Amino acid sequence: MPQTEEAFGTPDTREFDYAVRARGISKSYGDVEALRNLSLDFPRGQLTSVLGPSGCGKTTLLKIIAGLLSPNSGEVEVNGKPVTGPGPDRAFVFQDFALLPWASVIRNVAFGLELRGVAKSEREGIAHKYIKNVGLGGFENSFPHELSGGMRQRVGLARALSVDAQVLLMDEPFSAVDEQTRRKFQEDLLSLVQQENKTFIFVTHSIEEAVYVSDQIALLLPRPSRVSEIIRPTGIRNKGTDNIRRDPEYLDIVDRIWGSLRDYVE
């Protein structure tokens, strides 16, 4: 299936400023080809979901953008500069929380700032701000084992936001929480995208989640892994969080994406 722009949804005629650009990315693990000649642009200040079935290279692409993996060929640029490794312009929100078990919430959130040499009073002030922004005010002195899975993931998100990276990379961050918590996270994420003016790159297996939270959806298909379609659900972005899932365009996009993926689900 060829790559197509504006596959579904209201046509978007805006010209974009791209924060992240991937060009001709190929990556193999031994004889297993994870990505082949993949190119993809990520508009600045927007949330792009990378969606596709298991084994299509979503997490591999995210780690290459983060600088945690090197491609066999091709290049990623962030703000016009080639990615050669991890950098302060990118922050990663992990699927498994990746918190320090012996550290309090505020220490976990401030940890990245501590590594950068930010003074204690300044980093704690920044940490307090983002702890409040993600809905954890009052839990600053709690420890990870005292928190629910959803609360621990909020700590991870606050930590990523606190370092003021321009690009936030999120690897299925809501997969380990229950459905009610997941929906609340999705609503909060929409607010954060509007407030923070950062570029979010969001890996998910959930079609419904991708359509709900995204300004742009990159649909990846396997064998070989490639970008099949770029979808911009612009018609539902201003419907309000309570109305998006009831909108006919939302339902149509979800259904059409499933039609594209059905044959690749094992």
Identify the residue ranges that each predicted region occupies.
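Non-catalytic connector elements of ABC transporters
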Residues: 2-9, 243-266
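Short, glycine/charged-rich "phosphate-handling" switch motifs in NTP-dependent
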Residues: 216
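A general structural signal marking secondary-structure boundaries and capping sites
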Residues: 72, 165, 221, 261-265
